[in-house]
Amino acid sequence: MNKLIPLPREFFARDTNVVSTELIGKTLYFQGKTAIITETESYIGQNDPACHAARGRTKRTDIMFGPAGFSYVYLIYGMYYCLNFVTEAKGFPAATLIRGVHVISPENLYLNGPGKLCKYLGINISHNKCDLINNNAFFVGDIGLKLPYSTTARIGITKGTDKLWRYVVTDITNLISQYNVQP
């Protein structure tokens, strides 16, 4: 049985697209539920019109300016929460949106869409600005899983749609049957 431990802050404090691709196959642990990350999107800096920090630093976007390895949770359409992980060097606003996961515990369930995964896991605005490194209840770990993924344009946005910054697993059949993970 593998013991799941949080990834180090250095994992998140890198180029956002590198972090987004390397999060594919990593394990998200949240309050007793374990899921494999299957889809991510990058939002990078003030030159990315789809990034919340494109217009500068605000109370809402302050967390995006670092340090890396913290959660950025916000509400969209007045009803859906979205989970992001802050990336890059402190002072540079960037984050990876977690768009999809495959839950492996307590049940086997594929969740496509950031709102669906937050609803199922119970993630809400109270989980904004959580340290993912020094936290036993909410973190990302690595069980050595490498999954094939494709790169596409980001979806669900109206600006910055030309960026190929969405990463999605190409085959989820029999995804996790050989892994036994214990947080």
From Swiss-Prot:
UniProt entry keywords in alphabetical sequence: DNA damage, DNA repair, Hydrolase
Top-level EC class as recorded in UniProt: hydrolase
Name listed for the protein in its UniProt record: Putative 3-methyladenine DNA glycosylase
SUPFAM superfamilies in the record: FMT C-terminal domain-like
Family affiliation: Belongs to the DNA glycosylase MPG family.
Any one GO biological process: base-excision repair
UniProt EC number: 3.2.2.-
CDD domains the UniProt entry points to: AAG
InterPro entries reported for this sequence: Formyl_transferase-like_C_sf, MPG, MPG_sf
Top-level taxon: Bacteria
Molecular function (Gene Ontology), one example: alkylbase DNA N-glycosylase activity
PANTHER family listed in its UniProt record: DNA-3-METHYLADENINE GLYCOSYLASE
